[in-house]
């Protein structure tokens, strides 16, 4: 079990209550530390509008090569990932044969990231067998994508106001971003 969290804001200077974004993402990560006590990491874009946080429980790749957030070899994509891809070795072998990949480590996260870089997000998701939740930042398009497995086994909570967006493996992480949480009844009915 790992923990993921992050946020996007249109006003990068300060978050609610006049806190710095670095302070906020660190607080968000600390609330989910029990999900991944081995290591934590943060990523933010050049404009300081997007922040990704990860709490790591090392299982597949115990080295620092499995650290997250992780950025693709091409530099276009950055990801925080929680879960397991059961068929990652098959996908890794296929990418190695086709593209002669030089892998940094042995994590399923790196395999997912490079698969997305190679075939695109939609095509990559079709190939996956596993349980997972992730946030993927596309640096070229300046877009954030959230994804979960078909059955939603791994938790992923979201908060959105139109100018601010936050997510986390637990609501506690989002509570560090805002004091203004409420349930959207239409989303619950979906």
Each predicted region: which residue ranges?
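Cysteine-centered catalytic environments shared across enzyme families
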Residues: 1-190
């Amino acid at each position: 079990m790992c923990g993921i969290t992050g946020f996007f804001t249109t006003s990068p200077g300060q978050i609610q209550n006049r806190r710095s974004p670095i302070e906020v993402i660190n607080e968000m990560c600390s609330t989910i530390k029990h999900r991944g006590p081995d290591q934590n990491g943060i990523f933010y874009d050049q404009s300081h509008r997007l922040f990704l946080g990860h709490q790591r429980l090392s299982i597949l790749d115990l080295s620092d090569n499995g650290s997250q957030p992780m950025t693709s070899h091409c530099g276009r994509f950055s990801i925080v990932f929680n879960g397991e891809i059961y068929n990652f070795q098959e996908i890794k072998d296929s990418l190695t044969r086709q593209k002669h990949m030089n892998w940094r480590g042995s994590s399923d996260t790196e395999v997912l990231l490079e698969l997305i870089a190679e075939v695109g997000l939609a095509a990559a998701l079709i190939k996956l067998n596993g349980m997972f939740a992730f946030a993927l930042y596309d640096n070229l398009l300046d877009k954030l994508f959230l994804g979960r497995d078909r059955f939603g086994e791994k938790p992923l909570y979201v908060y959105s106001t139109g100018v601010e967006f936050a997510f986390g493996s637990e609501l506690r992480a989002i509570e560090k971003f805002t004091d203004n949480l409420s349930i959207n009844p239409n989303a619950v009915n979906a």
